[in-house]
């Protein structure tokens, strides 16, 4: 499939099948993020895959209280480290831009693999940080 076809195929999914995602597919999605461009190639991110630990999954779900989110078989938390990100001369920090590019690479890779994704930004970041730390 062409890139344009892939971009058209990807959409926000909020209804998931009740089955686990194969580890190989998760690794391919993460590899797409690793290959994403970032300012000066600093890659100021790390990703936490939440799939098998029901206790952590439930605590993370409390940071974004939507029923569909609780039903996702996998959640990948994209974490930025602003101390590692490139800063422009005027102080503009590119961490969030770099992470957005990496996450978009993941969503496109997932779509190519037949997996549905949905960006979630309106979660309680402080609470999520405490759960995942």
Regions found by a protein language model. Give the residues of each.
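Small-aliphatic-rich amphipathic alpha-helix that forms the alpha element of a beta-alpha
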Residues: 33-34, 76, 90-131
